[in-house]
């Protein structure tokens, strides 16, 4: 082991191997270094590796040279930007914001745009719950009220049936308000209808005519005009001072 590595510090053994130097002396260390350097040069000269280090450092020299000079193969930054803008103009001519607009919002925007564009060509203009038909052949626009409630105009309906109830009578009736033109005619017809088949008619009986309006409030006859009553009545109740039954049925 000591012979192979030559690490023995004994001068006797080193003289046998042909190395006459002492590792403890500085001059001996320099001599060994020069010897090793000579052997290295011989080895490189033998195998033709004299330019190995130069070849290894050549790419680094090229890199340093390229860092100081512009690369001829690189494109001009202005040309690259112009080509990018040109491609974007070909693909999509519209302005796209960031973040991108969702597909549902794009569809809604296109639909809203078409709806507004068609609205200007439509002869009907919507204003709240009223529709005004603009006709060039008619001097005055026609106005109609939109609504499915019973408070619509009585002239626009063919019939208007209202439920009627009288105190002491178990069965309610329905009458067409459009067949009457005043409170008196309606009251007389209702009293006659209820007392004709009921044994409840008395001369000293007083009747109170009440009705329920469109807002749900109960009103007396005469609180509003007949026209408003005919348009807003939902239910009628006739109260008797002396009913046949001792219970009063108001609904």
Swiss-Prot record:
Q: Which UniProt keywords apply?
A: Auxin signaling pathway, Nucleus, Repressor, Transcription, Transcription regulation
Gene Ontology annotations for the cellular component aspect, listed alphabetically: nucleus
Q: Which factors induce or repress this protein, as stated in its UniProt record?
A: By auxin.
Placement of sequence motif EAR-like (transcriptional repression): 3-7
One GO MF term on file is: DNA-binding transcription factor activity
Q: Does the keyword Repeat apply?
A: no
Oligomeric and partner information: Homodimers and heterodimers.
Q: What is known of its domains?
A: The N-terminal half of the protein contains two conserved domains I and II. Domain I includes a slightly degenerated ERF-associated amphiphilic repression (EAR) motif which seems to be involved in the activity of transcriptional repression. Domain II is required for the correct degradation of the protein through the SCF-mediated ubiquitin-proteasome pathway. Interactions between Aux/IAA proteins and auxin response factors (ARFs) occur through their C-terminal dimerization domains III and IV.
Q: What does the UniProt function comment say about this protein? A: Aux/IAA proteins are short-lived transcriptional factors that function as repressors of early auxin response genes at low auxin concentrations. Repression is thought to result from the interaction with auxin response factors (ARFs), proteins that bind to the auxin-responsive promoter element (AuxRE). Formation of heterodimers with ARF proteins may alter their ability to modulate early auxin response genes expression.
- Indicate what this protein is called per its UniProt record: Auxin-responsive protein IAA29
**Which organism is the protein's source?**
Arabidopsis thaliana
Gene behind this protein: IAA29
């Amino acid at each position: 082991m000591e012979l192979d590595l030559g690490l023995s510090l004994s001068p006797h053994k080193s003289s046998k191997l042909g190395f006459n130097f002492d590792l403890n002396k500085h001059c001996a260390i320099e001599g060994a270094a020069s010897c090793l350097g000579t052997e290295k040069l011989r080895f490189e000269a033998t195998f033709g590796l004299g330019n190995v280090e130069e070849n290894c450092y050549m790419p680094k020299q090229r890199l340093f040279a390229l860092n100081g000079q512009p690369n001829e193969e690189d494109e001009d930054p202005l040309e690259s930007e112009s080509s990018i803008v040109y491609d974007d103009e070909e693909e999509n001519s519209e302005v796209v914001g960031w973040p991108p607009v969702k597909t549902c919002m794009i569809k809604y925007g296109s639909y809203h745009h078409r709806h507004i564009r068609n609205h200007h060509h439509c002869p009907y203009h919507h204003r709240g719950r009223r529709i005004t038909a603009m006709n060039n052949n008619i001097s005055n626009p026609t106005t109609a009220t939109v609504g499915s409630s019973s408070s619509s105009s009585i002239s626009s309906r063919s019939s208007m049936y209202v439920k009627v109830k009288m105190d002491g009578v178990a069965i309610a009736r329905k009458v067409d308000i459009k067949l009457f033109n005043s409170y008196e005619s309606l009251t007389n017809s209702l009293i006659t209808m209820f007392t004709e088949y009921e044994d409840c008619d008395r001369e000293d009986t007083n009747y109170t005519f009440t009705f329920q309006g469109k807002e749900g409030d109960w009103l007396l006859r005469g609180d509003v005009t007949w026209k408003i009553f005919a348009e807003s009545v939902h239910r009628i109740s006739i109260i008797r001072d002396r009913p046949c039954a001792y219970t009063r049925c108001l609904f």
